[in-house]
Amino acid sequence: MFYKNRPLSPYVTIYSSQWTSISSIFHRLSGLYLVFFLFVLFCSIKFLFCFSTFWFVYKFVKTCFFFILSFFIVFIVFSMYSLFYHFFIGLRHLVWDEVILMEDNFVTMSTKLSLSLSLVLVLINCLRYFLV
């Protein structure tokens, strides 16, 4: 029996993606990004403490201040979104461990809800910290 529009496998290029598969991939990527963010944060703190007494480092930071500041702000905003998204998807998985809300419509709704709540929290924090 042949079904015309049925996907064969998730590895086939004609496979139609769902919200849950995309959110699972982005959950893993956000975890990797958070590890990268912590590594860069600790390395930059170490760099500032080790080389803060040298005049050439001070001069370099002073000349590139706006570039460094804009890069840092974008880095912080992406990190906030990644943190909130990873948190909400983790909460969703904790609910799923108790076998609650496992129907298809609730699964899709929880994915969209976690995406939107993450965006709302990032916007609130950006307004709170960057515009005050």
UniProtKB/Swiss-Prot annotation:
Residues spanning the signal sequence: none
Known function: Membrane-anchoring subunit of succinate dehydrogenase (SDH) that is involved in complex II of the mitochondrial electron transport chain and is responsible for transferring electrons from succinate to ubiquinone (coenzyme Q).
Record's cofactor remark: The heme is bound between the two transmembrane subunits.
Subunit structure: Forms part of complex II containing four subunits: a 70 kDa flavoprotein (FP), a 27 kDa iron-sulfur protein (IP), a cytochrome B and a membrane-anchoring protein.
Molecular function in Gene Ontology: electron transfer activity; metal ion binding
Keywords assigned by UniProt, alphabetized: Electron transport, Heme, Iron, Membrane, Metal-binding, Mitochondrion, Mitochondrion inner membrane, Transmembrane, Transmembrane helix, Transport, Tricarboxylic acid cycle
Gene Ontology terms: cellular component: mitochondrial inner membrane
Protein's name according to its UniProt entry: Succinate dehydrogenase cytochrome b560 subunit
Tree of life domain: Eukaryota
Listed pathway(s): Carbohydrate metabolism; tricarboxylic acid cycle
Location(s), subcellular: Mitochondrion inner membrane
TM ranges: 32-49, 59-81, 107-127
Primary site of residence: mitochondrion
InterPro entries referenced in this protein's UniProt entry, alphabetically: SQR/QFR_C/D, Succ_DH_cyt_bsu_CS, Succ_DH_cytb556, SuccDH_FuR_B_TM-su
Keyword hit for Ubl conjugation: no
Gene: SDH3
A matching Pfam family: Sdh_cyt
Known cofactor(s): heme
Topology class, membrane: Multi-pass membrane protein
GO BP terms, alphabetized: mitochondrial electron transport, succinate to ubiquinone; tricarboxylic acid cycle
Binding-site positions, heme: 86
Family: Belongs to the cytochrome b560 family.
